[in-house]
Amino acid sequence: MSRLFLPVLAIVLVSIGASHTASLEWPSNLVALSSVKSSQLLPIASEDSVELADGSSGSVSSSAAQPEDQSQEEAEEQQVSSASSGSADPISGRLVSAGIPVSVPLPLILAARNGLRTVLTIQEPAVAKVGEVVQHVPTAVSHQTQTVVHDHRRLVTPIVAPAVRTTQVIRQQPPLLWSVASDPRVVLIRN
């Protein structure tokens, strides 16, 4: 019986020791998120609290510094991943006010819903201002400088294609009402 008891005791002690070391390495806010019973996030140890803990005991400061370093690395990785994935949050946070002129390669396709699009054929050497009333003018369209604006995210995506000049006005809906989220005034794009 003692032969069976000793290996089981060793396995239990090793697993308890591993669980204690693993819980010390996790940032405190992630530990609070993983437990179902806790409803509040625990604050991550700041530099002041680490310095205070350093004065009292060296082991506490070394264990508190590791979660802080890991949480900083995780925050940097999240920033890099959100920048590479192209999320809309940083774009929506930088909305342009109506008074500032913005240089936009023209023409624009403003898509309010899927399948509804309006090609604005504006004379190409032009600067479009946000909040400006724009008209449909049948002039030459250069597909090389065509820019697609996704209305739901305000993303500007350049399209590179062979330079073929055509004259076209594509309208699949009545005149489009368009407003910018930061400026509640409605802009009418009329014929």
From Swiss-Prot:
The lineage of its organism: Eukaryota, Metazoa, Ecdysozoa, Arthropoda, Hexapoda. Disruption phenotype: RNAi-mediated knockdown has no visible phenotype. It comes from Drosophila melanogaster. This is Retinin. Residues 55-69, 78-88 have a biased composition (Low complexity). GO terms for cellular component: extracellular space. Coiled coil: none annotated. Residues 1-21 form the signal peptide. It holds the Pfam family Retinin_C. Keywords: Phosphoprotein, Secreted, Signal. Specifically expressed in cornea (at protein level). Detected in retina and cortex. It comes from the Eukaryota. Residues 52-88 are annotated as: Disordered. It is found in: Secreted. One of its GO terms (molecular function) is structural constituent of eye lens. InterPro entries: Retinin_C. Its main location: secreted. Phosphorylated.
